[in-house]
């Protein structure tokens, strides 16, 4: 099979990225993140209570919920609420978002409160979980900044930024930031969550069509690191404008 050739962008290029801070007025932090045709609204809400297992421990918590609007995909998705339960995919993704954010927050400095992250996909074209993590960090930083500016916290508990991106191999070609057609037809698909200092929080890798070697994985991680560096700059630009 011939090597895959992207028409609209280079193999090591992100899709067009746009992050709009303060997208919604009735929450402590929010943004709209657009990664090509994938669009996710991310919000952060401060709750002056913690889950029961943390009461009296003088530390906070960050948790996340994720969902897709019925019209976010080409054919209407049934609302999970109407089915009476969340899908395994939804539970997996929201746990991933929560883990990724908690990894960069000092929970003791956050104090005995929690921040609830909501990621709602309004248009899906691949990479919704990675876009959610990248956008959720912006919403979280805005909410925490509010706690600091209001004098509730004396210092910012966020240690460093975090972002995520997908990489994969399509017809033998390593690609950065897969869209839906690429993701659905790839040989392998890897989602990588990384901090600003280059530390890996999570790697989710699957051989969809053909197994990949450790050498190939290393190349994909390097490709992801390049993309995440660019995403971190987009986050910084959005927060500077917030």
Swiss-Prot record:
Catalytic activity, reaction form? tRNA(n+1) + phosphate = tRNA(n) + a ribonucleoside 5'-diphosphate
Determine the domain of life of the protein's source.
Bacteria
The family database entries (InterPro entries) matched by this protein are listed as: ExoRNase_PH_dom1, ExoRNase_PH_dom2, ExoRNase_PH_dom2_sf, PNPase/RNase_PH_dom_sf, Ribosomal_Su5_D2-typ_SF, RNase_PH, RNase_PH_bac-type, RNase_PH_CS
Q: For binding phosphate, which residues are annotated in this chain's numbering?
A: 89, 127-129
Disulfide bond entries: none
Q: Which GO terms describe its molecular function?
A: 3'-5'-RNA exonuclease activity; tRNA binding; tRNA nucleotidyltransferase activity
Q: Which GO terms describe its biological process?
A: rRNA catabolic process; rRNA processing; tRNA processing
Q: Name one Pfam family in it.
A: RNase_PH
Per UniProt, subunit arrangement is: Homohexameric ring arranged as a trimer of dimers.
What is the purpose of this protein? Phosphorolytic 3'-5' exoribonuclease that plays an important role in tRNA 3'-end maturation. Removes nucleotide residues following the 3'-CCA terminus of tRNAs; can also add nucleotides to the ends of RNA molecules by using nucleoside diphosphates as substrates, but this may not be physiologically important. Probably plays a role in initiation of 16S rRNA degradation (leading to ribosome degradation) during starvation.
- NCBIfam families listed in its UniProt record: RNasePH (TIGR01966)
Alphabetized PANTHER family for the sequence: EXOSOME COMPLEX COMPONENT, EXOSOME COMPLEX COMPONENT RRP41
Q: Return the similarity comment.
A: Belongs to the RNase PH family.
Name under which the protein is recorded:
Ribonuclease PH
Native species:
Neisseria meningitidis serogroup C / serotype 2a (strain ATCC 700532 / DSM 15464 / FAM18)
Q: What is the lineage of its organism?
A: Bacteria, Pseudomonadati, Pseudomonadota, Betaproteobacteria, Neisseriales
